[in-house]
């Protein structure tokens, strides 16, 4: 799975979850509960919507060792809108299929008068230069040292060098900070582009995430 927590239109009572799964997986559900429910005894499950995603397939890209290649990225894109949540709570969730269960992910709903966020931008994930991602996560570690209780992450775009390279998104989403927070942000030009600007579309950003559809047209 390649999983990320995104904002819903009203994050005090809803949250959007996005993930990609292999096309051979026939069924996925999301299981979620309050974080304090250590044994998942009060968990709820829901089915989600899915569609076949092909927008990243055969996009010209690059591997971590510098080898040029074309992305092999046809997968099932799942979107789950968790609703009727309680404000000011920490939740956890996991993805369950007939084949495997994901790690546990967490997020906090909004609603408090006071909150804090980690703000980050322009780290341009690029596997041949792994230090870019490492340095970005190290910066977040420092923010966490200063404020262990920050609630969510705001990114200001250009977090991926080539948004059309799905393998770049996959590597980034494996990081621990993507498992513990909701990430809200905007799409920069790099998030919308493929290598060398061969193609430029916000479909890359859209299919790598699950944002509410209440923004401007397109």
Give short role names for the model-derived ranges.
Residues 72, 79, 90-106, 167-218:
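Extended active-site neighborhood of metal-dependent phosphoesterases/phosphodiesterases
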């Amino acid at each position: 799975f390649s999983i990320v927590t995104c904002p819903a239109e009203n994050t005090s009572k809803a949250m959007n979850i996005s993930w990609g799964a292999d096309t051979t997986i026939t069924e996925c559900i999301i299981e979620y509960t309050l974080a304090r429910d250590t044994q998942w005894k009060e968990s709820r499950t829901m089915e989600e919507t899915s569609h076949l995603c092909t927008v990243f397939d055969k996009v010209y890209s690059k591997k971590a060792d510098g080898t040029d290649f074309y992305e092999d990225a046809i997968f099932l894109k799942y979107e789950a809108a968790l609703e009727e949540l309680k404000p000011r709570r920490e939740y956890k969730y996991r993805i369950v299929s007939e084949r495997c269960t994901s790690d546990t992910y967490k997020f906090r709903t909004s609603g408090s008068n006071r909150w804090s966020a980690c703000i980050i931008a322009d780290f341009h994930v690029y596997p041949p230069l792994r230090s870019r991602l490492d340095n970005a996560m190290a910066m977040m570690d420092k923010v966490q040292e200063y404020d262990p209780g920050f609630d969510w992450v705001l990114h200001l775009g250009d977090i991926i060098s080539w948004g059309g390279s799905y393998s770049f998104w996959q590597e980034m989403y494996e990081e621990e900070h993507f498992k513990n927070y909701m990430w809200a942000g905007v799409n920069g030009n790099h998030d919308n582009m493929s290598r060398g600007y061969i193609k430029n579309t916000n479909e890359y950003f859209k299919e790598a995430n699950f944002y509410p559809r209440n923004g401007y047209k397109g």
